[in-house]
Amino acid sequence: GFTSSPIIIGENCLIGANTVILKGVEIGDRSIIAAGSVITKNIPKESVIIQKRELN
């Protein structure tokens, strides 16, 4: 079997397209997450998350 944990998304968050949020993660109020990000840890309120990507 497997276990699951809820994902909690705060109020007024902006989450870009193709973002992956892993189980058990909490995203604080008024946070912004850029498109294509992979979120593995909790995000504090009023954060801006941009994942660095290399282009080939």
Where are these regions (language model features)?
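Left-handed beta-helix
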Residues: 4-5, 10-11, 16-17, 22-23, ...
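Conserved switch/coupling elements of ABC/ABC-like ATPase nucleotide-binding domains
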Residues: 53-56
